[in-house]
Amino acid sequence: VLKHYDLESKIITIDIDSKINISCDQQLMMIVFDNLINNAFKYANQKISIVYKQEKIIISNDGSKIENKDINHIFEPLYKADVSRNDTNSTGMGLAIVRNILDLHNYTCKVVQDEEVHFIIEMNK
């Protein structure tokens, strides 16, 4: 997935457990990762991290935060967050597609924010 991005424009950290065993439709999950990583590149100031451990995939960036009023809606079709995060090329469908694909796999995605914005995929069994 990362080969499509300008890797020199950001500081990227990847931390993957050596024992990965994910049961999924590979093509659909590539769409999920592409959407989340694309958003990370779009909104990051400098840092992006991709972490896999303990049945969780966490894609984080150090960009602008998502307004609290938007958090519960960003996975809805056609929803676009506040103006500072809006992209004229955005359809508002990316995160809705992510949610639908994850639902098909019985996985969940939530957003947690501290100094960074973290999209956390939990692979429920």
Predicted feature locations:
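Conserved catalytic submotifs in the C-terminal HATPase_c
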Residues: 11-21, 53
